[in-house]
Amino acid sequence: MTELKTLRHELEREILQQGYSLSSFSHTSGVNRGVLSATLNSSTPRPISINQLDRMNMALGKPEGWLYELFIEECLSLEQKPNWRRVRPLIVRCVELQRSDLIDRILYLLLEDPSYIDEVFCLAENLIQKEEKLAILLYRYVIEYERNSHSERLVVSHYRIFKSLIGNNIETNLKAALTFAPYRNLLPIPMQLDALLKLANIYYSLQDWAQTINMADEIYILSSKVYQLRMQARQDQRVIPFLDLERPLVVYYGQGLLLKCAVYEQEEMYDKAQVYVDLFADLQWFEDEHVDNQYYIDRFQFYSIIHTMNLELLTGKEQGLDRYLQILEQHPQEVLPSTLIILEAANKYGYNIDQLLSRYEDIIYPADILDYLIAGSKARYNYQDVTIGINRYINLYYQLAIYHCDRNIYDERLEKILYTLESTIERYNRGRIMDCLHLFKKLRQLTGSLEK
């Protein structure tokens, strides 16, 4: 007995068991009587649509998705060439029902014929905003069956999957970045800029300074090229090409510079860092009709002030600390990254920052780090991943422990710091545990001296 007969016979048997005639069932289900007759009684049954099957299921009191497995086999296994007009509504309906198992079966059968890859890709693009998890399943099949290794749909599929994998675990993000990175330069320009920024954030959170610099350079070069093309088009009185960027172009341009500044700060190459501070300090020349262009120009000017003060503290100029604290009072969103820099400078030069640590204890020890960072990530000015904040907290607790150790303080504060450091690393970045060996050695020396 074929699968088609099984689907027809299952429907026919259930209709008869519930006492319906064709006329009464047509009235109850809303399916045309002629369609029912052609489907159930004809020697060459007429294929039904997924919408008609849903109506029959509802009339029979069956759960949503009843007989879908048999419908799939009829639709895809028995027809010589599947009809996309039947298959597309079927996939959409399976998405609505969250039936990834059925979608998996549909795609397996459908993509034996590679001519359907483009239809599957376009459907995934339509679904990505509302049903990301199931759209990703479609992209995975595009990747599996696409034969052209340089096709745009293949590269975009890799990018969509990469974006979906980025989360709060730094090690998981690294795996996603390593898989996607080879495709980044094949993306359309708008996606390429966003992809480069995401990759840069991942590498920065991993403290992979060389790769962060590479991504920052690519962001700067590409955003500069786009800007030049826009200006040339304006000069030639041509229509400026529209780019559907996630953020204004100045964000990418400025972030390419800011990332290099931040890396050189970390590598203690302070003269180089200052060069890039000067470059993003004044971007008033950057023309863009985007409504938020001026807002971000002002943000980069503000960041130049912050990083200038960072460099002063990191080069031993303690007199700038009071002004820094005044600015933090007005801009509490900068407390986390700034406190980390101030702690590093304090540990390097012996500054006393007890007042700062006491003032911002609620930010240093939030009830839930992730909730605090996610809330901050929704701010208008924020374009960094949450993982950068997580890594800052790990570094913050590490520097805090050193700060208290250097002052021979072993009390409940240090216990709290060590516990929070350990739990944060365990949850978000277990690879950092080796970095703490020096700290633990220092703690053993401290506790040993106190016991004596």
Please report, for each region that a protein language model flagged, where it lies by residue.
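Flexible inter-repeat linkers and adjacent short helices
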Residues: 1-174, 410, 416, 422-423, ...
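Solenoid-like repeat scaffolds
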Residues: 31, 43-44, 74-79, 95, ...
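"A position-specific structural signal for the A-helix of alpha-solenoid helical repeats
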Residues: 85, 89, 118-126, 153-162, ...
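Helix-turn-helix repeat elements of alpha-solenoid scaffolds
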Residues: 92-103, 127-140, 165-179, 209-238, ...
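Mid-protein regulatory/catalytic core that forms ligand/cofactor-binding pockets
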Residues: 112-246, 250, 262, 266, ...
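Alpha-helical linker/edge segments of TPR/alpha-solenoid repeat scaffolds
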Residues: 163-174, 204-211, 240-262, 301-319, ...
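Alpha-helical scaffold segments of alpha-solenoid architecture
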Residues: 253-384, 394
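C-terminal structured domain segments
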Residues: 374-447
